[in-house]
């Protein structure tokens, strides 16, 4: 039994949103933009937490949560078949002003009021583990007991593997565990669960939903990447993992359907942004994945307030350096090296899909020493970049003919393009270097 969608209305900082769920969900976005709100809404809907007055965004309006479940095991289907319609089970919680909470289930096309007890009985088919950023002793004990109860229900409680988990859990429950050790023990526990699940070719915690807030805390980058891989493997084998994170090590462009960006607006509060369509086709998939493996740091684009797309290393180094020199550099803007001009449209597709503000910087490449065929080919690539841009949140700047000519304010010979990043940085870092007016204007536009 898997949660597939949840409509959220009038909850905390959310006026209305409806995320669609993958087995692995990655909730990202700036602090105070709604990540905790969407997670708390899911937890309340699943019966894991109580309703508090402050959870209702506007007390004069109804609160409503409506979720749909799919993919039932044989045992689940047998117990819930009376409630399943067209392979889906749909539940609703409503709270009208001055009235008690109502629980409803959709039977065929009609809504039927049910008791809270019946509601919770239905949801008991989805075990839950919750890991907040920090836990006290009582919460740690509850987490450990919940984990072993899940394993017991799945007849894994007497397994040899469970003994090693118990050793880790005993250390976790120690009175003198530091926050750093606590987080590292959680890392070891989930790595063990993932490894054992892979051996058995199914999740040993079944369809459990794991809520894990900020799993990156107190972990070094290599451990973050390994834990993220453990999450991927577990989700592929049947577990449901809902992660909120500020670390690009828990984001992969390959799993873009798992990404849910929370954004906050003055007019209508926080909203979830996802893209469930197909971004690339044919050779685009191969080239994009190859490009990603060359530089996996590109995942940071999902955390940026604005993304600056550039062709190569020279542009990335020089633009950042000159922006600092001009006093306009912004740390919440990410300069993304795409690798080549032909790859830029693919990144634009990705940014368009998630409505992330961006500006694409590319070389016109119409140098006087180029052949007509080279210039025609270059212009085709330039036009493909321009056509890909959604000007609601994207733009472009064209260098004439490349950043080197902009830096030196002169036409460049073909022979002058060896060791470009080194010589470009050497030039702009000289004390008497004056940024040409045309280049300064372009950098100011990039960082506006």
Regions of interest found by a model, annotated:
Residues 1-47, 174-297, 317:
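Switch/communication elements of ASCE P-loop NTPase nucleotide-binding domains
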Residues 17, 127, 208-209, 306, ...:
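The start of beta-strands in P-loop NTPase/AAA+ ATPase cores
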Residues 39-86:
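Conserved P-loop NTP-binding catalytic core
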Residues 56-69, 115-138:
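ABC ATPase nucleotide-binding domain signature region
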Residues 60-65, 87-89, 122-128, 239, ...:
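Short glycine-/polar-rich loops that comprise or flank the Walker A/P-loop
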Residues 104-106, 123-212, 373:
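Extended helical coiled-coil dimerization/tether regions that scaffold
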Residues 257-366:
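RecA-like P-loop NTPase motor core
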Residues 364, 369-434:
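Activity-critical C-terminal alpha-helical subdomain
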């Amino acid at each position: 039994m898997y949660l597939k969608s949840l409509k959220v209305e009038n909850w905390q900082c959310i006026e209305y949103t409806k995320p669609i769920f993958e087995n692995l969900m990655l909730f990202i976005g700036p602090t105070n933009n709604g990540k905790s709100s969407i997670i708390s809404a899911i937890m309340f809907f699943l019966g894991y937490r109580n309703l508090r007055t402050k959870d209702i965004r506007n007390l004069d309006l109804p609160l409503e949560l409506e979720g749909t479940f799919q993919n039932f095991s044989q045992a689940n289907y047998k117990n819930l078949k009376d409630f399943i319609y067209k392979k889906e089970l749909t539940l609703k919680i409503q709270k009208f002003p001055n009235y008690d909470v109502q629980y409803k289930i959709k039977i065929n096309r009609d809504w039927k009021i049910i008791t809270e007890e019946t509601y919770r009985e239905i949801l008991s088919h989805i075990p839950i583990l919750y890991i907040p950023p920090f836990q006290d002793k009582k919460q740690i004990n509850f987490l450990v007991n919940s984990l072993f109860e899940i394993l017991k229900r799945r007849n894994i409680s007497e397994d040899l593997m469970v003994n090693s988990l118990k050793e880790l859990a005993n250390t976790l429950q120690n009175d003198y565990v530091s926050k750093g050790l606590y987080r590292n023990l959680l890392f070891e526990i989930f790595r063990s669960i993932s490894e054992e699940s892979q051996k058995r070719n199914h999740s040993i915690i079944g369809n459990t939903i794991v809520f894990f807030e900020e799993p990156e805390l107190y972990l070094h980058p290599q451990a973050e990447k390994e834990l993220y891989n453990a999450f991927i493997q577990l989700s592929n084998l049947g577990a449901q993992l809902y992660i909120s994170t500020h670390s690009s090590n828990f984001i992969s462009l390959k799993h873009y359907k798992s990404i849910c960006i929370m954004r906050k607006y003055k007019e209508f509060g926080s909203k979830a942004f996802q893209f469930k369509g197909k971004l690339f086709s044919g050779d685009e998939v191969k080239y994009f994945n190859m490009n990603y493996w060359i530089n996996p740091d590109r995942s940071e684009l999902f955390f940026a307030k604005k993304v600056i797309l550039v062709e190569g290393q020279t542009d990335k180094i020089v633009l950042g350096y000159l922006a600092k020199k001009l006093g306009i550099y912004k740390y919440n803007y990410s300069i993304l090296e795409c690798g080549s001009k032909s790859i830029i449209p693919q990144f634009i597709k990705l940014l368009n899909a998630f409505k992330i503000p961006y500006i694409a910087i590319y070389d016109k490449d119409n140098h006087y020493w180029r052949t007509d065929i080279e210039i025609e080919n270059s212009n085709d690539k330039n036009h493909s970049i321009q056509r890909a841009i959604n000007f609601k949140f994207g733009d472009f700047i064209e260098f004439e003919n490349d950043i080197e000519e902009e830096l030196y304010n002169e036409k460049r010979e073909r022979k002058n393009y060896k060791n470009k990043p080194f010589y470009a940085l050497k030039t702009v870092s000289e004390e008497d270097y004056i940024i040409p007016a045309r280049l300064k204007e372009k950098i100011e536009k990039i960082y506006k």
